[in-house]
């Protein structure tokens, strides 16, 4: 058995707080002396070297780690989300179709199917917009700004990307004008 594997077997029971009986019942054979020999040096390390006990590390609550989960259904009811998202996507479809008549872009094509809006701008790239019902968001993939997730903001009456505070319509207007050379009014 490799040295690293033996080291892990000696240290693992202490970190997992497993008794030798429990380990044997799971098919792992470890002698009590081996466990005791590995525990004593670790106890000294945790008490003296770091002033932190091992049990404080293994019983730490992970609820404080990372962002809190959001119950999106409480933010926007599903029926209201679909109504707002469908209206927005259909509105964008109509406006961008009209815009396509005014710009000379090889490969310009807009398609809406399976609740996904796809705008192809030939060699300039492709936009994809779709609903994410569980999150109550509209997701956009842009050849300019990359992926964005827009939440409905009741106060602003707009879809907002929380990371940058960008509004969906405004962001699309700016990017399409820069890419295609013609202004567009989406709002």
Curated annotation (Swiss-Prot):
Entry EC number(s): 1.16.3.1
Keywords of this entry: Heme biosynthesis, Ion transport, Iron, Iron storage, Iron transport, Mitochondrion, Oxidoreductase, Transit peptide, Transport
Matching InterPro entries: Frataxin, Frataxin/CyaY, Frataxin/CyaY_sf, Frataxin_CS
Listed Pfam families: Frataxin_Cyay
UniProt GO MF annotations: ferric iron binding; ferroxidase activity
Known catalytic reactions: 4 Fe(2+) + O2 + 4 H(+) = 4 Fe(3+) + 2 H2O
Highest taxon in the source lineage: Eukaryota
Cell compartment(s), UniProt: Mitochondrion
Gene Ontology process terms (BP): aerobic respiration; embryo development ending in seed dormancy; heme biosynthetic process; intracellular iron ion homeostasis; iron ion transport; iron-sulfur cluster assembly; regulation of iron-sulfur cluster assembly; response to hydrogen peroxide
Matching SMART domains: Frataxin_Cyay (SM01219)
GO cellular component terms attached to this protein's record: chloroplast; cytosol; mitochondrion
Subunit relationships: Monomer. Oligomer. Interacts with NIFS1.
Family named by the database record: Belongs to the frataxin family.
Function: Promotes the biosynthesis of heme as well as the assembly and repair of iron-sulfur clusters by delivering Fe(2+) to proteins involved in these pathways. May play a role in the protection against iron-catalyzed oxidative stress through its ability to catalyze the oxidation of Fe(2+) to Fe(3+). May be able to store large amounts of the metal in the form of a ferrihydrite mineral by oligomerization. Binds to the mitochondrial cysteine desulfurase NIFS1 and increases its activity.
PANTHER family: FRATAXIN (PTHR16821), FRATAXIN, MITOCHONDRIAL (PTHR16821:SF2)
Name this protein carries in UniProt: Frataxin, mitochondrial
Species whose genome carries this gene: Arabidopsis thaliana
Annotated gene: FH
């Amino acid at each position: 058995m490799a040295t690293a594997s033996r080291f892990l077997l000696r240290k693992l029971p202490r970190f997992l707080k497993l008794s030798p009986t429990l380990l044997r019942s799971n098919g792992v054979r470890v002698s009590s002396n081996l466990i005791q020999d590995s525990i004593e040096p670790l106890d000294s390390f945790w008490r003296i070297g770091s002033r932190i006990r091992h049990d404080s590390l293994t019983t730490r609550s992970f609820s404080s780690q990372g962002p809190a989960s959001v119950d999106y259904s409480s933010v926007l009811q599903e029926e209201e989300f679909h109504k707002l998202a469908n209206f927005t996507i259909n509105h964008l479809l109509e406006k961008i179709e009209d815009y396509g008549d005014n710009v000379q872009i090889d490969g310009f094509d807009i398609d809406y199917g399976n609740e996904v809006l796809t705008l192809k701008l030939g060699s300039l790239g492709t936009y994809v917009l779709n609903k994410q019902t569980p999150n109550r968001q509209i997701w956009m993939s842009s050849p300019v700004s990359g992926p964005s997730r827009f939440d409905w903001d009741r106060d602003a009456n707009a879809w907002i990307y929380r990371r940058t505070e960008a509004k969906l319509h405004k962001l699309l207007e700016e990017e399409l004008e820069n890419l295609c050379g013609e202004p567009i009014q989406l709002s």
